[in-house]
């Protein structure tokens, strides 16, 4: 295996055995590809903005003598870059400019004569742009648009499973769901009549829609029924016989023909009888006259002599009618073939309940149902019906819908019109009737072949189209009203509705969510999330168990593990590692093709529908060298069931063992040994881990860590290979390799690093370089680590030495006992950055002012403010300190003449303003790390703002000039090379100042040309620099675009350092969570024979009942990894030669049965081996991939190599007494996470505060500075103790006895500790409520 330069620094030992046929795909492609499709020009007009424009334009005027046509569009450049947008609180977007053409036709002239054409580019609002990491910056905050899993358009056949009617009869229904437009439902009622609903309204007999489509009763019967023909000959009744129709019936008369009796009366007709009749080719049999009674005629019969209707189609025959027919000369009678078995008379029955009899009455009936209360006219009824399903503006099945529709009806072609045809409706009814007759199956709605993914691009396109349609109406009005000769396209288009629709979607749609930015994993998971909620989806209340359940088709598409606990369980899912969407939006997963019993490396992506026809082997099936299956019987999946198949039946094989799970679950080592419920908690809790001060790679990982860290975008990754030319904390410069340079560029890549910025969850984002000067790097190498990454690997927590044993009750009920050493070494110290903003507004009484001159505030409180009233950077502040001094004008009070005089003398201003300064919230303390001042255009900037501006300008200039220097140096080295090659002596050249070099002339023409080109580049570089500097200066000095009425905003950033403390929540990766109960002194912790104390003591009782044994295996393997690290460390300390080190490390990498990883250290230089050993001395990192991990024997081997007991248990001694514990204890290294549920954020106390308006009880919750609820159960407890006075105090003066509590406050102030409880306010509320019910309750004083 080839390792890049960075990967060689620390190679993770991989225990995986299955070959990696397919690399993990780029994890954010579902977001990026979808949005790319939305904004890129699509010549076909199938997707994105192009499709939206083409569907709405051209817009014609009502008269038809002018139209507005769409030509093309382009997106401009964004005004600010992503960082600037976040700082300023604006949206990162680009202006959309559309070229439109206004065509005016001659009025009197023949059709299509053009009078005038005007073309113009029109601004159509801003389109938010996606950042490189798949997010949007909306109003300064990063948001993610979550993909939606919704029911695919098409036709679905379903049943109520016997739940609707009391008899338990199964009622079938069909539903045609378009992409946009009205839903059409067909359903049976308990009497087996077929009904239709449009948009889930009142139901009508289904034949109404057929009549509205201009079918007569005869045609309807002809469509849905086979005919039975009776002939009257010589006063005898004969029937044309189709023997197959008799199957299963009982003969009501002797069936005979040609003098031979085939079936006797009363006998059941069997397949043998039918074969006999077919063999003898019996076509006609005589039937008794009574047999025809009750049959239904298939067409109208008219007496031709009188023109009188004898019987209408769909009438039941009686013997009288038969006689009449016979008399009027009708000898051949067509009736409908029905039976109770598989040809039900449903349509015939429905026609009997159908009140309409022609097209008009059917249309009117539909109109009445859709628009109750409006008087129907013929035109209105016709246009309404036409617009429902047959108009491209109002109805669209979409390509997906048409494909699903045709597949469902077993048609050959999969393309077709987006609107419905007569055949479509009739075929759906026919199929529904077939299902009712027992032929065919109903669909499974939860099958992933019937649910598709709607991603960002598609949802944005739909929203954009909504905006365009709103504009379309206005344009039509303007085209009809305005004077067309003076109008330009610009005058017709109002961009407001479009930008409003787009803004509404990105800002407040249910699927546009505030990004979860706790750590890189939570970002990636959020972008790969799939929600069934949202507009056009399900609602929490309506979703049943079936929708939430894991479905066989989820395999390899949606993760069966990662989903939230609580009301959203199963509705919000996560995309599996290898899953992707196909052109129709269905999820598909990759498989290896099996040809002639050999598993190839050819990869096919299959959707859930396609997969149903194949037999698919699991990824862990054993193969020999050639790729044949070793076992005769292989475990496979087929049609959603898992069973054994012989090896020659297999069509495909899974690509990887981790193809089933999502990214979050694939990071849990030994997932295969954990119970699913706990694995779910583990996957969810990894997303809540807070990035620690120093990231620490997991000793036991799964091999997915690098992919997640790199794809999440928190690290700086090399775009091109080269050599590190410069590196400091804030930037890395790479001199690019010659072969990767573009022609005519300096060949320098500059990476600016993010330093100490705030994430959405207030955690700290900071990048640190992990390369050093002169190192070679390749494309894709990690140059700098972000939060929670260590040498380019995801590192959410810390490796802790844990022991599983009880310790004095401090680990009762999942509590965790932690050593003081963990606090001393700052292992779980995290930095949180809070943003506090102070807004100065223009009020009715005058502007608010930001100043250090605040009334009634002592000197001490102002000590941390500068003269502008803003806190210094670096100040240590605690709760209640002033950060920004601000005064607000107060209403003028009438002054006495004396006061006026004093005011005039002393200029006292304190009385007419009140203090409204920004203070540090209670319970928060930290260091000010940054201050930003935003000033409205036209408002004078204060001193601090100017200082900040100057500093920013200096910094920008410094950055740009350094950048210029680096690029110049690159250029001049190339100029020097050309000059030296052209014959100039190097010594003389170096004595000459650099800017004079370009004045030299060369005799070699080719070299001279090269020199001139380089000179041009140099000028261009300087020009570019000036331009960039000017743009930067303009951006920094220009006023800010603030909300109406806002004059200034001051943002103060506080950094808070949080050490771990009792009450913080910690967890492992296997759903083993707990709260820290005590921080124990190091000397009291249990220690081993070498005197090494453990860091954490966990309760062994937390393991067996929860069945997450993965944590024990992780602990053992962690111990082995650490043991090997210790041996390497000892060798380094003894300064043993490189050969011995190389040999030992090689042994460690080679250990394990047929592992796929082959590390050959003989190809490494001594220096590389030493660096590798240096990085391994704290423990050799190990990968144990999901479902393909380390086996017990391998763990034991590794333990043996590290000179550790293979049981994984050692003897421990009590730190307090020095006595040995009575039995060996499992000790090892487990990866522990600190979760974002910190006790500092939850701790809260109140004495007096705000009260609820109606009940006068204290509010609840920390945010409202609320009280503690003394609930029902607590009242019972006090009642049980008989503590009457305490209870009285709780229910009155400490809660809602208004007079009592003020009195008590007064008493306490006076030093008199007595209380007088009165009437609780909520009791009065109760009285009022009872009175409102008409019961008068009065309290009488005795």
UniProtKB/Swiss-Prot annotation:
The modification N6-acetyllysine is found at residues 1022, 1200. PANTHER family: DNA-DIRECTED RNA POLYMERASE I SUBUNIT 2. Acetylated on several lysine residues in the presence of glucose. One of its GO terms (cellular component) is cytoplasm. Pfam families: RNA_pol_Rpb2_1, RNA_pol_Rpb2_2, RNA_pol_Rpb2_3, RNA_pol_Rpb2_45, RNA_pol_Rpb2_6, RNA_pol_Rpb2_7. GO terms for biological process: bacterial-type flagellum assembly; bacterial-type flagellum-dependent cell motility; cell motility; cellular response to cell envelope stress; DNA-templated transcription initiation; intracellular iron ion homeostasis; nitrate assimilation; regulation of DNA-templated transcription elongation. This is DNA-directed RNA polymerase subunit beta. It catalyses: RNA(n) + a ribonucleoside 5'-triphosphate = RNA(n+1) + diphosphate. One of its GO terms (molecular function) is ribonucleoside binding. The keyword Glycosyltransferase does not apply. Gene3D superfamilies: 2.40.50.100, 2.40.50.150, 3.90.1100.10, 6.10.140.1670, DNA-directed RNA polymerase, beta subunit, external 1 domain, DNA-directed RNA polymerase, subunit 2, domain 6, RNA polymerase alpha subunit dimerisation domain, RNA polymerase Rpb2, domain 2. PROSITE patterns: RNA_POL_BETA (PS01166). Keywords: Acetylation, Antibiotic resistance, DNA-directed RNA polymerase, Nucleotidyltransferase, Transcription, Transferase. It comes from Escherichia coli (strain K12). Its EC number is 2.7.7.6. Co-administration of salinamide and rifampicin or salinamide and myxopyronin suppresses the emergence of resistance to both antibiotics. Disulfide bonds: none annotated. Changing residue 665 to E: Resistant to antibiotics salinamide A and B. The keyword Cell cycle does not apply.
């Amino acid at each position: 295996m080839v390792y890049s330069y960075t990967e060689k620094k620390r190679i993770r030992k991989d225990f995986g055995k299955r070959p990696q046929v397919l690399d993990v795909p780029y994890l954010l492609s579902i977001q990026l590809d979808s949005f790319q499709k939305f904004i890129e020009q699509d010549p076909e007009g199938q997707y994105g903005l192009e499709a939206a424009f083409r569907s709405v334009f051209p817009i014609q005027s009502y008269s038809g003598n002018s139209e507005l046509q769409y030509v093309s569009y382009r997106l401009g450049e964004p005004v600010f870059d992503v960082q600037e947008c976040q700082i300023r609180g604006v949206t990162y977007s680009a202006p959309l400019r559309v070229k439109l053409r206004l065509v005016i036709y001659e009025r009197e002239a023949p059709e299509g004569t053009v009078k005038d054409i005007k073309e113009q580019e029109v601004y159509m609002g801003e389109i938010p742009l996606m950042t490189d990491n798949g997010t949007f910056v909306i109003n300064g905050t990063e948001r993610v648009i979550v993909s939606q899993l919704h029911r695919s358009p098409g036709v679905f056949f379903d049943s109520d499973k016997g739940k609707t009617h009391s008899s338990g009869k199964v009622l079938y229904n069909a539903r045609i769901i378009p992409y946009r437009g009205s839903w059409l439902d067909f359903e049976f009622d308990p009497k087996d009549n077929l009904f239709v609903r449009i948009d889930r309204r009142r139901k009508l007999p289904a034949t109404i829609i057929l009549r509205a489509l201009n079918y007569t009763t005869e045609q309807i019967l002809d469509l849905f029924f086979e005919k039975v023909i009776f002939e009257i000959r010589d006063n005898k009744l004969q029937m044309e016989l189709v023997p197959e129709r008799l199957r299963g019936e009982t003969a009501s008369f002797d069936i005979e023909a040609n003098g031979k009796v085939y079936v006797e009366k009363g006998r059941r007709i069997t397949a043998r009888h039918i074969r006999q009749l077919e063999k003898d080719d019996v076509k006609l049999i005589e039937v008794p006259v009574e047999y025809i009674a009750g049959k239904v005629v298939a067409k109208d019969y008219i007496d031709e002599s009188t023109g009188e209707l004898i019987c209408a189609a769909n009438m039941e025959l009686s013997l009288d009618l038969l006689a009449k027919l016979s008399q009027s000369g009708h000898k051949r009678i067509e009736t409908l073939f029905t039976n109770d078995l598989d040809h039900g008379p449903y349509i015939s029955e429905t026609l009997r309940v159908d009140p309409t009899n022609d097209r008009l009455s059917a249309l009117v009936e539909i109109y009445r149902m859709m628009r109750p209360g409006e008087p129907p006219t013929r035109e209105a009824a016709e246009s309404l019906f036409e617009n429902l399903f047959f108009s491209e503006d109002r109805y669209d099945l979409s390509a997906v819908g048409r494909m699903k529709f045709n597949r469902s009806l077993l048609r050959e072609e999969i393309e077709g019109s987006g609107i419905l045809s007569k055949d479509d409706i009739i075929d759906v009814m026919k199929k529904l009737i077939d299902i009712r007759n027992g032929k065919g199956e109903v669909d499974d709605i939860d099958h992933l072949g019937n649910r598709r993914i709607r991603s960002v691009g598609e949802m944005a396109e739909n929203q954009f189209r909504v905006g365009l349609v709103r504009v379309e109406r206005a344009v039509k009005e303007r085209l009809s009203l305005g004077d067309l000769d003076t109008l330009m396209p610009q005058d017709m288009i109002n961009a407001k509705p479009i930008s409003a629709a787009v803004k509404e979607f990105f800002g407040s749609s249910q699927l546009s969510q505030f990004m979860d930015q706790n750590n890189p994993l939570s970002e990636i998971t959020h972008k790969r999330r799939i929600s069934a909620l949202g507009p056009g989806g399900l609602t929490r209340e309506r979703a049943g168990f079936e929708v939430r359940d894991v479905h066989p088709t989820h395999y390899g598409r949606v993760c069966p593990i990662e989903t939230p606990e609580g009301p959203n369980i199963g509705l919000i899912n996560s995309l599996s590692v290898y899953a992707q969407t196909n052109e129709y939006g269905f999820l598909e997963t990759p498989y290896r093709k099996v040809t002639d019993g050999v598993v190839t490396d050819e990869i096919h992506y299959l959707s859930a529908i396609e997969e149903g026809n194949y037999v698919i082997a699991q990824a862990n099936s054993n193969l020999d060298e050639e790729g044949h299956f070793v076992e005769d019987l292989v475990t496979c999946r087929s049609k959603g069931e898992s069973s054994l198949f012989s090896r020659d039946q297999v069509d495909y094989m899974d690509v990887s063992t981790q193809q089933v799970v999502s990214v979050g679950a694939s990071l849990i080592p030994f997932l295969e040994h954990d119970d699913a419920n706990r694995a779910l908690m583990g996957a969810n809790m990894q997303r809540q881990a807070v990035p620690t001060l120093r990231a620490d790679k997991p000793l036991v990982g799964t091999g997915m860590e690098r992919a997640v860290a790199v794809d999440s975008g928190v690290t700086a990754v090399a775009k091109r290979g080269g050599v590190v030319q410069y590196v400091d904390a804030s930037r890395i410069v790479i001199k690019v390799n010659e072969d990767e340079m573009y022609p005519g560029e300096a060949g320098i890549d500059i990476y600016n690093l993010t330093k100490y910025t705030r994430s959405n969850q207030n955690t700290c984002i900071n990048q640190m370089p992990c390369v050093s000067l002169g190192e070679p790097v390749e494309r894709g190498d990690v140059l700098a680590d972000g939060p929670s990454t260590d040498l380019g690997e995801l590192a959410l927590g810390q490796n802790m030495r844990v022991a599983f044993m009880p310790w004095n009750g401090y680990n009762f009920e999942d509590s965790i006992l932690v050593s003081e050493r963990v606090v001393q070494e700052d292992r779980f110290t995290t930095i949180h950055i809070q943003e506090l903003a102070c807004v100065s507004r223009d009020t009715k009484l005058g502007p608010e002012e930001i100043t250090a001159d605040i009334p009634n505030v002592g000197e001490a409180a102002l000590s941390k403010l500068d003269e502008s009233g803003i806190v210094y950077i670096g100040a240590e502040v605690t709760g209640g300190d002033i950060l920004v001094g601000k005064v607000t004008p107060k209403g003028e009070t009438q002054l006495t003449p004396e006061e006026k005089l004093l005011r005039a003398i002393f200029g006292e201003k304190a009385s007419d303003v009140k203090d409204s300064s920004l203070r540090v919230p209670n319970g928060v303390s930290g260091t000010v790390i940054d201050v930003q001042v935003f000033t409205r255009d036209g408002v004078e900037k204060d001193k601090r703002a100017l200082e900040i501006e100057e500093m920013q300008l200096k910094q920008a200039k410094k950055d740009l000039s350094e950048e210029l220097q680096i690029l110049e140096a690159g250029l001049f080295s190339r100029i020097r090379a050309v000059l030296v090659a052209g014959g100039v002596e190097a010594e003389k050249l170096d004595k000459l100042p650099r800017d004079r070099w370009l004045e030299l002339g060369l005799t070699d023409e080719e070299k001279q040309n090269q020199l001139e080109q380089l000179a041009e580049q140099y000028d261009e570089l300087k020009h570019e620099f000036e331009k960039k500097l000017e743009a930067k200066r303009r951006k920094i000095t220009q006023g800010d675009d603030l909300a109406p009425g806002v004059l200034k905003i001051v943002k103060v950033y506080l950094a808070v350092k949080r050490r771990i403390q009792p009450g913080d929540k910690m967890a492992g990766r296997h759903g083993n969570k707990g709260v820290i109960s005590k921080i124990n002194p190091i000397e009291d912790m249990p220690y081993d024979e070498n005197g090494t104390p453990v860091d954490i003591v966990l309760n062994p009782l937390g393991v067996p009942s929860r069945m997450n044994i993965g944590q024990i295996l992780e602990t053992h393997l962690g111990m082995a990894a650490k043991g090997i690290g210790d041996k390497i460390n000892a060798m380094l300390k003894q300064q043993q030669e490189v050969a011995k080190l190389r040999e030992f490390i090689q042994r460690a990498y080679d250990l394990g049965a047929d592992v796929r990883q082959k590390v050959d250290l003989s190809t490494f230089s001594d220096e590389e081996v030493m660096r590798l050993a240096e990085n391994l001395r704290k423990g050799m990192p190990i990968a144990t991939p999901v479902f393909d991990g380390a086996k017990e024997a391998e763990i034991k081997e590794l333990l043996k190599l590290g000179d550790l007991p293979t049981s994984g248990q050692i003897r421990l001694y009590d730190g307090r007494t020095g006595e040995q514990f009575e039995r060996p204890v499992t000790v090892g290294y487990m990866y522990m996470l600190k979760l974002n549920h910190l006790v500092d954020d939850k701790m809260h106390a109140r004495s007096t505060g705000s009260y609820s308006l109606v009940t006068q009880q204290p509010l609840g919750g920390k945010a409202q500075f609320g009280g503690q609820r003394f609930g029902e159960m607590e009242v019972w407890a006090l009642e049980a103790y008989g503590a009457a006075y305490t209870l009285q105090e709780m229910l009155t003066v400490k809660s809602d006895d208004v007079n009592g509590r003020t009195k008590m406050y007064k008493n306490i102030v006076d030093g008199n500790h007595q209380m007088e409880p009165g009437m609780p306010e909520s009791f009065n509320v109760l009285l009022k409520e009872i009175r409102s019910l008409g019961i008068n309750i009065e309290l009488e004083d005795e």
